């Protein structure tokens, strides 16, 4: 039975039992920003189990794509070397949300395994939690499993409820016993039943885990029964396929065999049992589906894990002798195997292939040099009998050649060598400390403040009349008063000033009363809810307890708000044009521009930029209102608001609906999209691997930019005596004319070279049967010099020639030697003899070489020495 049929039979079986087939959720969890990847079937139902979400069904079944390759759940090092470890796998599961419980879950599992999959009942063993008599009795008395094949597992991990057969979502919350089903491969395979000293053998393989959530655990560890217990089961598709296809390794099932054959095809390896082929076959699944779900190779978070997996696959191909990109070619084979079950994979095939190709090309640029350094170090270590690689070298490979530490460790592990990771960590820490020392820190760092939080009024007001000074700081120290001319940080009890946050710069403005004026140049957070006003006291004395009018620079705020709102619209437009993988990686919003960094693997084309601009400006013209709502975080995310991975959000969040965009944001924005006026992208480029940056302007800045661009177009048209609408056509005509003139000039230079060649031939001096010529050819370029040397070689038959030309203080040199003379006189050595005397160097073949120099005044003497130099070698 093939893997595709096993998957289909599982889903159809549970559908026949009243379950709703729910499509696999993304590998990037949408409801848990703390989880790196979806690693089990229950992740998408977590809020349902917690009671925070309801679904229109109480029974569900899924085939869930899962990844375990980072953080706590990390199988990467074992992948390819064991029978059952994978980075990517499919988890088949059935779930009950307060509907059926142990009895039905156990009977369903037994019926599927024995009646649908036709597994022999006497090959199946089960485990239960040691005091779960209910589950034990169902297995023994209702299903009929003999007592000798039902094993009670106790608290085998050192504490109450710490057991392989007791599942917990976390330290608190839903939990309960579980029952695992094992398949016995028979006495020919070493190993013992679960709970025995030989349980790690391969004879008894776990194929299904049935989790019974029946308790809630509080912070004190007390267990109370849930009013509506739930069921969460999981069976690895690859494991059950190995059992049903009568093989002992998951890599021998049909799905993997096709991918292993494809890997062998691309690497030129005949031995299909090679572990490196298993690594590559496994990794193409994880990499492809991660890219489908919007992950792009990068240097942090999920992107870094993806990059590690890609590079590990490439490194194993390199180990097999594949020294050129190959990995991306396996995407088509994966689509052939899994595209029917996952149409999103087939749809994304071109993008997945392109992302992997670019990542391969990038890594192959550095891998050869880095590998040669590592191989040399390992050879030296082996000769010395050492078993530990220097951590400083590992850091150099990481820092200079882009080798992740785990890649270096992987290569070392195969040689029985370990990496000195503490030394690596020390080197990394030193680099970070140097980076920190080179940076400039804001003055709010280190301010000791223990007062009340600041009340912010800046969403509604641009000024606050009765703001009280509650703290003052000069050079980081708390003071009671500030005098005119001093720079300080002022903390108020109420303020309309927005503090730098979320990429938006802080406000500028004035704090003043009848006797005092404090110019605010920047606004930063002292603490999460405490705002510091940075600036200089221009007149008077400012004391703690004084009351001032706090007024922001409203025009600057308005320009900043336009740019911030445009950023939201641009983010949505980029996702619409480029794909859902686009995610914000950083931003800077000020009064002049918006700078937006995002995940994407290729430069934006001119057409893509125009489309993004058009979409944003359509939203501007729609003049849609900006609607702000404060709501619980979970409600906001469920309502479609975009939350950024890695950002910390409180229980209550601010949601901004602006046109077609909905994001969590605490910044300041326009009241309507029409207030943006005009949106224009002015720059696009790369800032890191997999990260692009777009800069854009809005409002009057955009108008001035377009006007200046229009003026330049008009000026260019006037210079070419054309109308602006005819400019491109006129430029094309001028380019054609230039090409024609260049062709004529080249012909004239060749003609001139030919005539000069005849004259120069007469200047050649015969030395030992070889004609030696060293001369200057006025006005010649490099091409003319080469052509002249070739003609002189033909004319003189046996010759050693150096020709030079001077242009703008630079010397060009060409040397040519006929074949009969090149055994003793090398053109590369000859041209270097002259070049070194005129401040340059060069090289080439024995019959033709070129060089340059920067000291034309020394050229006559250098050429005069050629005859003697040649004579000495004949």
Swiss-Prot record:
It comes from Burkholderia mallei (strain ATCC 23344). Catalyzes the attachment of alanine to tRNA(Ala) in a two-step reaction: alanine is first activated by ATP to form Ala-AMP and then transferred to the acceptor end of tRNA(Ala). Also edits incorrectly charged Ser-tRNA(Ala) and Gly-tRNA(Ala) via its editing domain. Belongs to the class-II aminoacyl-tRNA synthetase family. This is Alanine--tRNA ligase. Its cofactor is Zn(2+). It comes from the Bacteria. PROSITE patterns: AA_TRNA_LIGASE_II_ALA. Consists of three domains; the N-terminal catalytic domain, the editing domain and the C-terminal C-Ala domain. The editing domain removes incorrectly charged amino acids, while the C-Ala domain, along with tRNA(Ala), serves as a bridge to cooperatively bring together the editing and aminoacylation centers thus stimulating deacylation of misacylated tRNAs. One of its GO terms (biological process) is alanyl-tRNA aminoacylation. InterPro entries: aa-tRNA-synth_II/BPL/LPL (IPR045864), Ala-tRNA-lgiase_IIc (IPR002318), Ala-tRNA-ligase_IIc_anticod-bd (IPR018162), Ala-tRNA-synth_IIc_core (IPR018165), Ala-tRNA-synth_IIc_N (IPR018164), Ala-tRNA_ligase (IPR050058), Ala_tRNA_ligase_euk/bac (IPR023033), DHHA1_dom (IPR003156). It is an enzyme of class 6 (ligase). Its EC number is 6.1.1.7. It is found in: Cytoplasm. HAMAP family: Ala_tRNA_synth_B (MF_00036_B). GO terms for cellular component: cytosol. GO terms for molecular function: alanine-tRNA ligase activity; aminoacyl-tRNA deacylase activity; ATP binding; tRNA binding; zinc ion binding. The keyword Transcription regulation does not apply. Zn(2+) binds at residues 564, 568, 665, 669. Keywords: Aminoacyl-tRNA synthetase, ATP-binding, Cytoplasm, Ligase, Metal-binding, Nucleotide-binding, Protein biosynthesis, RNA-binding, tRNA-binding, Zinc. SUPFAM superfamilies: Class II aaRS and biotin synthetases, Putative anticodon-binding domain of alanyl-tRNA synthetase (AlaRS), ThrRS/AlaRS common domain, Translation proteins. Binds 1 zinc ion per subunit. Coiled coil: none annotated. NCBIfam families: alaS. Its main location: cytoplasm.
């Amino acid at each position: 039975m093939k893997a595709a049929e096993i998957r289909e039979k599982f889903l159809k079986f549970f559908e026949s039992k009243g379950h709703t087939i729910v499509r696999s959720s993304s590998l990037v969890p949408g409801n848990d920003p703390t989880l790196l990847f979806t690693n089990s079937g229950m992740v998408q139902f977590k809020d349902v189990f917690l009671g925070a979400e309801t679904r229109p069904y109480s029974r569900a079944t899924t085939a869930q794509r899962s990844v375990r390759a980072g953080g706590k759940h990390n199988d990467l090092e074992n992948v390819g070397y064991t029978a059952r470890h994978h980075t990517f796998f499919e988890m088949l599961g059935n779930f009950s949300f307060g509907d059926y419980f142990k009895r039905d879950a156990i009977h369903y599992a037994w019926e599927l395994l024995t009646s649908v999959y036709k597994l022999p009942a006497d090959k199946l063993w089960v485990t239960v939690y040691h005091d779960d008599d209910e589950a034990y009795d169902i297995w023994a008395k209702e299903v009929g499993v003999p007592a000798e094949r039902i094993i009670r597992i106790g608290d085998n991990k050192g504490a109450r409820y710490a057991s392989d057969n007791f599942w917990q979502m976390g330290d608190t919350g839903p939990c309960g016993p579980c029952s695992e089903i094992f398949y016995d491969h028979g006495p020919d395979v070493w190993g013992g039943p679960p709970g025995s000293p030989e349980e790690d053998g391969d004879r008894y393989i776990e194929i299904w885990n049935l989790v019974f959530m029946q308790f809630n655990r509080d912070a004190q560890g007390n267990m109370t029964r849930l009013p509506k217990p739930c069921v969460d089961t999981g069976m690895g598709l690859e494991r059950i396929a190995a059992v049903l296809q009568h093989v002992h390794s998951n890599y021998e099932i049909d799905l993997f065999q096709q991918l292993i054959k494809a890997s062998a095809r691309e690497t030129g390896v005949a031995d299909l049992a090679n572990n490196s082929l298993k690594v590559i076959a496994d990794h193409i699944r994880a990499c492809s589906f991660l890219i489908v779900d919007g992950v792009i190779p990068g240097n942090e978070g999920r992107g870094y894990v993806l990059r590690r997996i890609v590079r590990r696959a490439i490194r194993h191909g390199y180990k097999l002798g594949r020294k050129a990109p190959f990995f991306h070619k396996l995407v088509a084979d994966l689509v052939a195997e899994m595209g029917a079950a996952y149409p999103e994979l087939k749809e994304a095939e071109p993008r997945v292939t392109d992302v992997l190709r670019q990542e391969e090309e990038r890594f192959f640029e550095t891998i050869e040099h880095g590998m040669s350094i590592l191989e040399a170090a390992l050879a030296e270590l082996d000769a010395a009998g050492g078993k530990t690689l220097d951590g400083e070298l590992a850091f150099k490979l990481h820092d200079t050649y882009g080798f992740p530490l785990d890649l270096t460790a992987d290569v070392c592990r195969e040689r029985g060598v370990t990496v000195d990771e503490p030394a690596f960590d020390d080197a990394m820490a030193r680099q970070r400390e140097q980076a920190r020392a080179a940076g400039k820190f804001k003055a709010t760092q280190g301010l000791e403040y223990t007062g009340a939080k600041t009340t912010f009024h800046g969403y509604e007001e641009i000024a606050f009349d009765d703001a009280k000074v509650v703290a003052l700081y000069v050079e980081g120290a708390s003071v009671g008063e500030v005098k005119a001319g001093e720079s300080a940080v002022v903390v108020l009890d109420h303020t309309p000033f927005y503090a730098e946050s979320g990429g938006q710069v802080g406000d500028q403005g004035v704090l003043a009363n009848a006797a005092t004026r404090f110019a605010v140049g920047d606004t930063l957070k002292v603490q999460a809810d405490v705002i510091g006003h940075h600036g200089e006291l221009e007149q008077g004395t400012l004391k703690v307890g004084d009351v001032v009018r706090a007024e922001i620079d409203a025009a600057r705020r308005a320009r900043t708000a336009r740019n911030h709102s445009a950023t939201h619209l641009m983010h949505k437009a980029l996702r619409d044009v480029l794909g859902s993988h686009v995610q914000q990686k950083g931003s800077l919003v000020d009064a002049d521009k918006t700078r937006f960094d995002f995940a994407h693997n290729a430069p934006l084309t001119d057409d893509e930029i125009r489309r993004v601009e058009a979409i944003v400006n359509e939203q501007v013209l729609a003049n849609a209102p900006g609607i702000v709502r404060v709501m619980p975080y979970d409600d906001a995310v469920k309502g479609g608001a975009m939350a950024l991975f890695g950002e910390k959000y409180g229980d209550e969040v601010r949601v901004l609906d602006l046109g077609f965009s909905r994001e969590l944001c605490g910044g300041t924005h326009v009241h309507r999209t029409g207030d943006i006026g005009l949106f224009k992208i002015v720059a696009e480029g790369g800032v890191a691997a997999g990260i692009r940056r777009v800069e854009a302007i809005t409002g009057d800045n955009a108008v001035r930019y377009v006007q200046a661009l229009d003026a330049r177009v008009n000026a260019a048209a006037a210079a070419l005596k054309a109308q602006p609408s005819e400019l491109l056509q006129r430029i094309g005509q001028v380019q054609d004319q230039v090409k024609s003139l260049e062709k004529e000039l080249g012909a004239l230079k060749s003609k001139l070279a030919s005539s000069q060649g005849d004259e120069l031939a007469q200047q050649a001096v015969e030395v030992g049967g070889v004609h030696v010529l060293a001369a200057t050819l006025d006005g010649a370029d490099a091409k003319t010099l080469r052509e002249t040397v070739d003609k002189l070689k033909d004319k003189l038959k046996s010759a050693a020639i150096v020709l030079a030309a001077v242009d703008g203080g630079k010397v060009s040199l060409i040397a040519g030697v006929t074949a009969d003379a090149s055994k003793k006189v090398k053109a590369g050595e000859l041209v270097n003899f002259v070049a070194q005397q005129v401040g340059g160097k060069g090289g080439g073949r024995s019959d033709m070489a070129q060089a340059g120099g920067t000291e034309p005044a020394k050229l006559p003497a250098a050429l005069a020495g050629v005859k003697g130099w040649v004579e000495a070698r004949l």
